[in-house]
Amino acid sequence: MEDRVREIVAGYMGILVSEVTDDGNFIELGMDSLTLLKIIIDIENEYDISIADEEIVDIRNFADICKLIEKNFS
């Protein structure tokens, strides 16, 4: 799952998959809120999950996205 999510994030950011680190701050990588929303929508569709809007605002890095995916799979 993590590899695919890294690919999605890297694709939207226009960066290499290797540049998407667990704790790298998305804002420092140049991500804006619209890009984050597009990423979340793709992830929701790919994994057939729903992530609440109030959870999205707390996403700061790749590890945060993975935690939300795991939480919503449960």
Predicted features along the sequence, with ranges:
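Amphipathic alpha-helical interaction surfaces in cytosolic regulatory modules
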Residues: S33-I39
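Thiotemplate assembly-line natural product biosynthesis machinery
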Residues: M1-S18, N72-S74
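Phosphopantetheine carrier-protein modules
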Residues: A10-E28, Y47-D58
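C-terminal structural segments of small proteins and small subunits
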Residues: I40, D48-A52, I56-S74
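Residues in well-ordered alpha-helical elements
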Residues: D3, S18, I27, L37, ...
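General helical structural elements
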Residues: I8-A10, D42, D64
